[in-house]
Structures are given as structure tokens and as C-alpha cells.
Amino acid sequence: MTLTLNHCPAPAKLNLFLHVTGRRADGYHLLQSVFQLIDRGDVLHFATRDDNLIQRTTDLPGVPAESDLVVRAAKLLQTVATEKNPAKNFGADIAVEKKLPMGGGLGGGSSDAATTLLALNHLWQTGLSRAELMALGLQLGADVPFFIFGQNAFAEGIGEALVEVETPDRWFVVIEPGVSVPTPQIFSSTELTRDTKPVKISDFSGAQESFGKNDLQVVAEKLFPPIAEAIQWLGQYGDARMTGSGACVFCPFEQEQQADAVLTTVPPHWKAWKAKAIKHHPLAYLQQS
């Protein structure tokens, strides 16, 4: 029997700040950041299959199915499900509605993978806990556990050590500068600051507005001038900064009307949109404790 779960949100995130505090022996960078969920993202649709096949039914230019984090997440969970119940087949058709830009620093691919793990854990009745799903997610990428964690979080380590943090209700204007940033290019730069002094959660909670910076931003601005142009333009309205390794930039506003007013003035060569801060992942209800 085919079971379906349609219109599953895969929300984007913004890095309210992002500090690089060191580097591990294996080359991974040590980070501190606050991840903020927003109400804009991709949308996924799932239907179970009885033949053990995992199929992405959507054509995504430049993203082969076999390397797509969505397919990799499904196959990873399929392996665990099969080990738990060898007599049963675990297959799925997955459709992906991409609304977020690739290489934008919004966590789109990671969020898609997390939504896949949450949805198929439910449909396949795999019974994995949130912690177990987060551990699987870490095998796919450092940002995936956050989206399974499902709450705004202070992140450390390579981004996988998460503590829930309160953030204010507000709106964001986000600009897509029209470039796609390869994350490895930013982290491999000799100009990247890798020794920012670590901060505490209380430092962020006590300041919130305009706290910290994005250490990756200086490198990205030099490599991709449209990012610098977007930050300079948006900065006339508030504390504009880049999210993740770019390319998207954002600025917070207390009122929706303020965000709407700024949107009407964005130069036409940029794509821009508004988003609302949210406190929990929309699929949090699917999680096992």
C-alpha cells in the first residue's frame, strides 16, 4: 500500500552571526553561530514504494539524483530500516520543489535532507529518535543535524553541537545577489580569519541585535563583488550581513511593514524577498523524542 506525505516544508536558515574559532586536525573548521529558522524554504512530497527503489521524480538541473542529499538521505535511512526489518521493502518516490537558490548560504540542501529523514522515518515507521536521526544527518553534512534539531540554536564544533536559544520575533529582507558560492572555496582561502575569540551563549542573548559578525563575509565579498554590493546597498537600512558562506545577504526588521517598504526599493537586477523568523521546524510534530 502506498503511503504519502505531501507538502513537507524544508525551511531555510540564516546565520545571525558566524565565527570561525579554529581548525581541527582533519581540516574541518570549528565554528560558533546562531542558526535562525525562517518561514521560506523548499517543499518536498513523499510516496512510499513496495519495490525498495528510491527515486527522485523531479529533474533538478546541475544536481544528479545519485549525488542529491535528498536521495542520499533516503538511502541512508533505508539501510537502517532494512537492518531493523529485513523482511520489508523500503522505497520512496520523492518530488522536490526548489524555492531556495543553490550556493546561497540558506542551508537548502541540508534542510531538504533533514525533511527527507523526518518524513521517511514517519512513513516507513522506522522509529528512530531525534538524536538518532541527527547522527544520521551528520553523515550527510554538518548543517543537517540543526534542521532535525528543529529549534533556533547556538551551534559549536563543526556546527553539530546545538543548544536551543531564544531569538526575537522579526522579519528579514533577503537578497540573492545572483552568484552561487562554492563553500570549499571560502573555507580554503588564505585570507579567512580562523582565530576569532570564542563567545558564550549569554554574550549573544544579552546583545542579540548586531551581535558578532560573519567571518566568511570578507573573503566572499572579495571573490564575489555582487555580494559586497548587496551588503552595501541593504546596509543603508540596518545591520546587513551575509548568511553562511554566501551568497545571500539579509537585514532584520522589527515590523513587517518595514520589510515591505525596503522590498519596494530593491534594484531590479537582484531577486529579493521577505521572511519571518520561526521558532520551530514545521515538521517537529513528526519527531520521536
Swiss-Prot record:
HAMAP family per the UniProt record, alphabetical: IspE (MF_00061)
Alphabetical list of PANTHER family matching this protein: 4-DIPHOSPHOCYTIDYL-2-C-METHYL-D-ERYTHRITOL KINASE, CHLOROPLASTIC (PTHR43527:SF2)
EC number: 2.7.1.148
Protein name (Swiss-Prot/TrEMBL): 4-diphosphocytidyl-2-C-methyl-D-erythritol kinase
Stored Pfam families: GHMP_kinases_C, GHMP_kinases_N
UniProt cross-references to SUPFAM superfamilies, sorted A to Z: GHMP Kinase, C-terminal domain (SSF55060), Ribosomal protein S5 domain 2-like (SSF54211)
Active site, renumbered: K13, D143
Role noted for this protein: Catalyzes the phosphorylation of the position 2 hydroxy group of 4-diphosphocytidyl-2C-methyl-D-erythritol.
Broad class of enzyme this protein falls into: transferase
Highest taxon in the source lineage: Bacteria
Pathway the protein acts in: Isoprenoid biosynthesis; isopentenyl diphosphate biosynthesis via DXP pathway; isopentenyl diphosphate from 1-deoxy-D-xylulose 5-phosphate: step 3/6
Annotated coiled-coil segments of the chain: none
Keyword set, alphabetical order: ATP-binding, Isoprene biosynthesis, Kinase, Nucleotide-binding, Transferase
Similarity field: Belongs to the GHMP kinase family. IspE subfamily.
Catalytic activity: 4-CDP-2-C-methyl-D-erythritol + ATP = 4-CDP-2-C-methyl-D-erythritol 2-phosphate + ADP + H(+)
Amino-acid positions noted as binding ATP in the UniProt annotation, renumbered to this chain: P101, M102, G103, G104, G105, L106, G107, G108, G109, S110, S111
Gene3D superfamilies (alphabetical): 3.30.230.10, GHMP kinase, C-terminal domain
UniProt GO MF annotations: 4-(cytidine 5'-diphospho)-2-C-methyl-D-erythritol kinase activity; ATP binding
Keyword flag ATP-binding: yes
